[in-house]
């Protein structure tokens, strides 16, 4: 089930024991604690498949403890971290270390991806199979694409041997290295160096040839252009073994948000044109885009309050992911089931997690939210240690009320 409305649920020993209209409250043992969710929607806990955890190395921006608190506030029960920590997650020992720390302090479930190449340098393949055996759910070079096609081909072939997942940040680095925003008349007017939109589809097109050759599982992060949506739609019709996601900025904002040199709207990939934004929504509507992720990228104030071309990329997103996705429901672009599928079932399937669904005898990872509750986004109230959001002051509808992980109430508003 993708959600429950007006039904009861029983949780016992951290598992979903039963759910449905047939449950009579007056017949439930007094040993159960009763929680009133009248007027609320119970959904599977959100699965966020692209998160920068920052620990180890940049704990002043985020820690495993702070990120898990931020996640549960946003209704996220499972999050998948990218490998670009310091040191880089390119060996099993680092995965084991993060998982051990997560078991000690995290409220949510935290999973790792490993880097495709050693130290994210794009040259030498890392210990992929050993990381896979240690729990890595996939392999990515984080915020970089691998420029050398021979290296990428070796990675595809290697990962195929154990049915692993390649995750791509699709940007041709030779076209993006000097740019800081989408290349357009807006970048020209602002006097900022632009990144051409086709830097994204060029890498996707290249990688699709490797998918055709190897049939390796391939996932594309934060799709942002109409051209990429068109290519992915065609590739899926061809039957290629691919999936993709996007993030709220790419269906909520466009390049005009960079006006006045707003560094909090400086993202990677950059915010695109209005036509691109509308194409992302169409991709979500027709199922071309499988999942929605927060793309949570914490940055401290000093890293953002610089001239635009010097400021760091990225925005936090754990605590706004649900509400911004529900805006697609309120604006009649998606129905509630489509929206929740992008946040729960689909990412869980892509990363082979036993979550993202309401099912008997499975972990009670649940999000209880009010679809119509209005609130104003205020980063000063975030649990995240970083406050860099382009949505500061935005009035949204839909708010998480309670979060359960393995049947335990870990957040309540």
Protein language model features and the residues they cover:
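C-terminal cap of metal-dependent C-N hydrolases
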Residues: 307-310, 363-413
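Alpha-helix-loop-beta-strand connector modules within alpha/beta enzyme cores
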Residues: 43, 92-109, 157-168, 320, ...
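Active-site metal-binding motif and surrounding structural segment of the metallo-beta-lactamase
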Residues: 24-42
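Divalent metal-coordination and catalytic microenvironments
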Residues: 14, 39, 50, 71, ...
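Metal-associated gating/positioning segment near the N- to mid-region
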Residues: 38-104
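Histidine/acidic residue-rich metal-binding segments in metalloenzymes
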Residues: 123-292
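His/Asp/Glu-enriched, well-ordered alpha-helical/loop segment
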Residues: 189-217, 264, 285-292, 297-371
